[in-house]
A protein has these predicted regions:
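Extracytoplasmic small-molecule ligand-binding "clamshell" domains
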Residues: 29, 33-37, 43-68, 84, ...
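Extracytoplasmic/secreted envelope proteins and their assembly/folding machinery
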Residues: 24-31, 56-59, 107, 159-162, ...
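Short, intrinsically disordered, charge-balanced linker/junction segments flanking boundaries
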Residues: 184-188
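Sec/Tat signal peptide C-region and signal peptidase I cleavage site
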Residues: 2-8
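Short helix-initiation/N-cap motifs at beta->coil->alpha
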Residues: 47-60, 153-157, 169-183
């Protein structure tokens, strides 16, 4: 006879990803698979769209046990494993095929590095390629230097890239980007 706990566990998981987004749909599908495989002894309560606060607030809530999980951008995870920024190096990849190949070689090492830093990783999701978007034409670096350029808060790689071409980056959390655009704090 194999014994197991009949107690149910509900994992509370937060993310900035909006409800209805590809990422939330994927997380919900994965959660349903776990729920089915455990006969609903393990369930999930999702907190999308930043309702639990920004990424720093979510990490604090995880530390005190209010949340059991989160989907976080790599920049927020630097304190657990500094090499986590490897995939964010600008212009490193030329195609999604190249990304897939490199990920097949490095994901396990990243997951192990996070575990050593105290963070259990259930998966790594791609965010796609990053682009500068602005209402003003940008033809040369001097044009970009005149813009108010947003970079994700704690994204060291993006901030250093901006600085390397003479741009003073404005780091903001994702929920602060739309208000920043509306008020003119950032425009790129």
């Amino acid at each position: 006879m194999v014994g197991y706990s009949s107690h149910a566990a509900t994992f509370k998981v937060a993310t900035l990803s909006p409800d209805g987004s590809f990422w939330m749909k994927t997380m919900r599908e994965a959660g349903k698979e776990v729920e089915a495989a455990t006969d609903n002894r393990v369930t999930f309560k999702w907190y999308p769209g930043g309702v639990m606060g920004d990424d720093k607030a979510v990490l604090r809530k995880m530390r005190v046990g209010q949340l059991q999980g989160a989907a976080l951008p790599m920049g927020e995870l630097l304190s657990f494993f500094p090499d986590s920024q490897a995939y964010g190096i600008p212009f490193l990849f030329n195609s999604y095929e190249e990304v897939d190949y490199v990920r097949s070689q490095l994901d396990d090492a990243l997951i192990a590095g996070f575990a050593e830093g105290g963070m259990e990783v259930l998966g790594i999701a791609e965010g796609g390629f990053g682009y500068f978007l602005t209402a003003e034409p940008v033809r040369v670096p001097a044009d970009l230097q005149q813009q108010r350029v947003w970079v994700p808060q704690n994204d060291v790689v993006s901030a250093r890239l901006a600085q390397s071409i003479g741009v003073t980056p404005i780091p903001l959390t994702l929920p602060d980007v739309l208000p920043g655009l509306q008020t003119g704090l950032v425009n790129t």
